[in-house]
């Protein structure tokens, strides 16, 4: 089936056979897979004007298509002819997978195509290769006469055999009936143990005879009656071609089992001719050995010697017993001539195998050289075609350039003529245009005059009409503006009213807010003022009390001083009068408080004092050198002495039978007031008095040195000796003693009004048990500087201080922590939020928050608004008296 390519005019361009493809540099034609129309693909370099053809809707130049297709077709046909001629002259190589018969036929044609000199050269090369290999193998053999004669015999034998072999080949080549060259057999003869090389000892003759007998083949006349041994080869395939297995020089009537010799040759060929050379060496050794035996046998007895006859040696050889027994059973034996003939035939087959390889190699080289020459020729032809094509293309380009130049000249001439015609035409058109312009101007002037007249009339009418329209428009605009002004006025009034209402509402809200804040501020100020006023009144009262107490104390000290001087004079007089009286007895002098005084003023408090209070005899302290005291401590000692003199009744009153028992409460109050007056100078005027909530429990470690007698009935006063540690006194004498430096109590004050103990200013409350043991020296375990004296607490810090609640006026010793106040404020705000007590912005009154937060305080202590503000700073938004937690609940 063919397809054709046609041009537009229906002319057939080229035929395409089925599955045929033509390719050139510019065009490629091939069959489509399932399309009935021809397909083509072209890479078009240029497109010129001319006759076109359409192939699959692609415009192509007919000349280029035809040229490209014809060129591709010519190359394809030439390549096909060349391939056919090569196949006819030289059949395909063996590597192409041909059958053995085709392979032999190919080698046969090649051999016949060679000249006589080429054939002789191939045979000579083979002979030289065998001789060179034999020389290389015998290079290291011994140099004895036997080995020398053996080498010479081998060379002579090879010369003879190759000469005869070439004659046979030449005769076969010149004969009319050309038999096929022998090819390798499919079977291989197991002859690895038949031939052995190297220098042999005395058994060389027997081994060579054995090898010769094994390689010998009976003639055709005896082939049917004498079978070959089993170990000499394999049977040929019954289906094989007998002609393929015939070597050169064989007759058609020969036995088919002669292929075993071919197997021997194949085996020799696979070993690169090594075993063949060994076989030749054995033959030469055998010949030399026979010659020596003949020479030795002539002296002993006449023996009939036949060349290459070694039947007796074969029969005596133990290794060849099986082969000899088979031939002895048949009753036939081979002569020496037959063995030599069989050896020559074996060599011919072996040489044919090796020569066939040489011929095959030469055939391959010849084919390769021919193909290379053909390729070079095709390359040269291609280059020639390319050069011709380039020349044609150059000529075509030159023609195109010349054509373009001619066309350009024609176009320039046409342009020049067109320009001249255009100038002439433009000139005529300009004259005609000028005439028409003048005519048009004249007509235009006439039209303008008429138009001006009409325009003046129309303008008058238009002006009157416009004035009327303007009047109507002004009236209409005035009405519209009046309506707009009226509407704007109403809107302005409404807006002003709305703004005024909003402003009033905002003002009312602001006023209410300001009033509320002002009320809260006034309330807070009132509370703060009340607090400040209360503090001021309390301070004034305390100042007055302190001033009054100071005046009274001054008067009291003056009076006591006078009384003391009197008492000293009286004591001195009594001491001189009663030197022999024991110290434990009462003094003879008596001091009686006047009955007109109901009590002694201590600290501004009037307390009743008994008129005649019996005083127990005072035990005198042992006369010991007293340490020097600092001025501060001396003042306290003087005050204690004044108190002792004041509380000690007059000696004259001891004899009075009337006994007055003072009230415990009044005596305790007097003692407290006296204690305050004694401690206040050391504390300074800025120290606030203890609040009403501060308990007065065991004020210790503050006692100045000195003993104070107890107020009670006679016989109930216990004397306590004063023991002052010398080291402690030295420590105190280094500087003024402050209340914080007095560390250890010297004694306790007893229950005022009852039987008490002698001691220093110490406990005001009655002790649980009276002091009955003597006062021990003060301990120096803790230094004075480590303790702080606090007269308002039960003890100073570092020993046994305990936090006690204070009052709001003088501050609290246990303030509420800030986190407790904040948490209580958050809980209170949440409660007020649930109750709806907050405004629209989430603020709540600080006073209400403070009152509610008092319930949520975990410590149970109260706090003020200022403490609430201080604790909630940063957690609450505080605006005036309003508070709100940041971030909400």
Swiss-Prot record:
Compositionally biased spans, kind Basic residues: 39-49, 397-408
Sorted UniProt keywords: Coiled coil, Cytoplasm, Stress response
Compartment(s) where it occurs, according to its Swiss-Prot or TrEMBL record: Cytoplasm
Biased composition (Polar residues): 201-215, 593-604, 663-672
Coiled coil recorded as keyword: yes
Residue stretches in coiled coil: 363-581
UniProt-listed Pfam families: NST1 (PF13945)
Keyword field contains Translocase: no
Chief location: cytoplasm
Biased composition (Acidic residues): 236-255, 295-320
GO cellular component, one term: cytoplasm
Low complexity biased stretches: 218-229
Ranges annotated as biased composition (Basic and acidic residues): 380-396, 409-577
Residue ranges of the region described as Disordered: 31-51, 197-255, 291-339, 380-610, 648-701
Function: May act as a negative regulator of salt tolerance.
UniProt record similarity statement: Belongs to the NST1 family.
Protein name: Stress response protein NST1
């Amino acid at each position: 089936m063919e397809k054709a390519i046609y041009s537009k005019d229906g002319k057939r361009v080229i035929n395409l056979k089925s599955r045929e493809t033509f390719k050139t540099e510019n065009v490629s034609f091939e069959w489509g897979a399932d399309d009935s129309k021809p397909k083509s693909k072209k890479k078009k370099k240029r497109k010129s004007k001319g006759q076109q053809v359409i192939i699959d809707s692609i415009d192509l130049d007919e000349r280029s298509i035809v040229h490209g297709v014809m060129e591709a077709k010519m190359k394809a046909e030439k390549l096909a002819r060349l391939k056919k001629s090569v196949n006819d002259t030289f059949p395909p190589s063996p590597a192409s997978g041909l059958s053995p018969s085709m392979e032999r036929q190919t080698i046969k044609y090649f051999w016949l195509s060679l000249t006589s000199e080429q054939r002789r050269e191939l045979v000579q090369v083979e002979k030289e290769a065998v001789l060179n290999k034999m020389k290389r193998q015998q290079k290291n053999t011994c140099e004895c006469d036997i080995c020398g004669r053996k080498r010479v015999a081998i060379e002579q034998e090879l010369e003879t055999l190759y000469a005869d072999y070439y004659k046979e080949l030449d005769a076969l080549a010149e004969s009319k009936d050309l038999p096929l060259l022998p090819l390798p057999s499919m079977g291989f003869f197991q002859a690895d143990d038949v031939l052995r090389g190297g220098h042999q000892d005395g058994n060389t003759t027997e081994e060579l005879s054995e090898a010769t007998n094994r390689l010998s083949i009976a003639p055709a006349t005896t082939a049917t009656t004498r079978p070959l041994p089993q170990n000499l080869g394999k049977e040929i395939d019954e289906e094989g071609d007998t002609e393929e297995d015939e070597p050169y020089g064989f007759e058609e009537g020969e036995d088919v089992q002669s292929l075993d010799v071919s197997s021997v040759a194949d085996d020799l060929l696979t070993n690169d001719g090594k075993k063949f050379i060994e076989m030749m060496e054995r033959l030469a050794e055998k010949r030399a050995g026979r010659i020596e035996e003949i020479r030795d046998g002539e002296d002993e007895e006449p023996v009939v010697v036949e060349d290459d006859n070694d039947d007796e040696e074969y029969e005596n050889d133990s290794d060849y017993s099986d082969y000899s027994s088979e031939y002895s059973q048949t009753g036939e034996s081979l002569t020496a001539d037959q063995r030599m003939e069989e050896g020559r035939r074996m060599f011919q087959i072996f040489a044919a195998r090796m020569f066939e390889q040489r011929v095959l190699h030469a055939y391959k080289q010849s084919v390769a050289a021919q193909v290379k020459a053909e390729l070079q020729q095709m390359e040269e032809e291609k280059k020639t075609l390319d050069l011709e094509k380039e020349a044609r293309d150059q000529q075509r380009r030159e023609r195109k350039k010349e054509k373009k130049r001619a066309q350009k000249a024609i176009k320039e001439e046409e342009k020049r003529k067109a320009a001249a015609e255009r100038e002439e035409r433009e000139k005529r058109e300009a004259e005609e245009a000028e005439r028409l312009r003048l005519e048009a101007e004249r007509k235009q002037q006439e039209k303008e005059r008429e138009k001006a007249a009409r325009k003046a009339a129309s303008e008058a009418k238009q002006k009157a009409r416009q004035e009327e329209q303007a009047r109507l428009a002004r009236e209409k605009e005035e009405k519209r503006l009046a309506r707009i002004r009226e509407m704007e006025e109403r809107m302005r009034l409404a807006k002003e009213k709305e703004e005024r209402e909003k402003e009033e509402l905002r003002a009312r809200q602001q006023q209410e807010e300001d009033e509320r804040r002002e009320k809260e501020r006034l309330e807070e100020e009132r509370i703060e003022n009340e607090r400040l006023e209360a503090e001021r009144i309390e301070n004034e009262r305390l100042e007055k009390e302190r001033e009054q107490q100071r005046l009274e104390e001054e008067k009291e000290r003056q009076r006591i001083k006078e009384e003391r001087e009197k008492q000293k004079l009286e004591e001195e007089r009594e001491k001189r009068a009663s030197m022999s009286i024991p110290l434990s007895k009462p003094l003879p002098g008596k001091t009686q408080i006047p009955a007109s005084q109901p009590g002694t003023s201590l600290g501004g408090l009037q307390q009743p004092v008994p008129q005649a209070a019996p005083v127990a005899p005072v035990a005198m302290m042992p006369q010991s050198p007293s340490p020097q005291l600092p001025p501060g401590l001396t003042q306290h000692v003087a005050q204690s002495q004044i108190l002792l003199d004041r509380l000690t009744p007059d000696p004259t009153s001891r004899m009075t039978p009337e006994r007055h028992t003072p009230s415990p409460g009044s005596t305790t109050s007097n003692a407290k007031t006296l204690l305050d007056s004694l401690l206040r100078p050391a504390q300074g005027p800025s120290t606030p008095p203890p609040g009403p909530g501060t308990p007065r429990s065991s004020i210790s470690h503050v006692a100045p040195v000195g003993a104070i007698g107890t107020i009670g009935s006679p016989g109930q006063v216990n004397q306590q000796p004063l023991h002052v540690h010398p080291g402690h006194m030295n420590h105190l004498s280094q500087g003024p003693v402050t209340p914080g430096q007095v560390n250890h109590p010297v004694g306790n004050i007893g229950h005022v009004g009852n039987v008490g103990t002698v001691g220093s200013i110490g406990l005001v409350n009655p002790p649980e048990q009276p002091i009955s043991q003597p006062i021990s020296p003060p301990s120096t375990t803790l230094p004075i500087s480590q303790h702080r004296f606090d007269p308002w607490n039960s003890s100073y810090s570092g020993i046994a201080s305990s936090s006690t609640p204070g009052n709001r006026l003088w501050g609290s010793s246990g303030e509420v922590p800030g986190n407790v106040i904040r948490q209580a404020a958050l809980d209170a705000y949440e409660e007020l939020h649930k109750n709806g007590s907050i405004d629209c912005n989430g603020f709540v009154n600080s006073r209400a928050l403070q009152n509610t937060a008092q319930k949520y305080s975990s410590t149970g202590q109260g706090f003020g608004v200022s403490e609430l503000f201080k604790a909630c700073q940063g957690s609450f938004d505080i605006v005036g008296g309003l508070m709100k937690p940041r971030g909400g609940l």
